[in-house]
Amino acid sequence: MANESNKTVKVRLVRGLRGTQSRHRLSVRALGLNKLNDVRELKDSPQVRGLINKVQYLVQVEE
């Protein structure tokens, strides 16, 4: 159980937000990504995975 809680995912913003839906922009901001090529290491949880799935065309995920 302890190993599962320590899992993280690295998320990188690889496409610009111009011309995207406002909900998708908010999801990217919720992931902590502000500029192009920003990288955040986030805890691997269902909530984070849901945000990533919503904007999968804008981000790159490294497990």
UniProtKB/Swiss-Prot annotation:
GO MF, one term, reads: structural constituent of ribosome
Report the superkingdom from the record.
Answer: Bacteria
Q: Known Pfam families for this protein?
A: Ribosomal_L30
**Claim: Ribonucleoprotein is one of the keywords in the record:** yes
Spell out the GO cellular component terms annotated for this protein, sorted alphabetically and separated by semicolons: cytosolic large ribosomal subunit
What SUPFAM superfamilies does the record point to?
Answer: Ribosomal protein L30p/L7e (SSF55129)
Q: Which keywords accompany this UniProt record?
A: Ribonucleoprotein, Ribosomal protein
Which Gene3D superfamilies has this protein been placed in?
A: Ribosomal protein L30, ferredoxin-like fold domain
Q: Please, one GO biological process term? A: translation
Q: What does the sequence similarity comment in the record state about its family?
A: Belongs to the universal ribosomal protein uL30 family.
User: Subunit notes for this chain?
Assistant: Part of the 50S ribosomal subunit.
* PANTHER family according to UniProt: LARGE RIBOSOMAL SUBUNIT PROTEIN UL30M, MITOCHONDRIAL RIBOSOMAL PROTEIN L30
Which named protein is this? Answer: Large ribosomal subunit protein uL30
What gene codes for this chain? rpmD
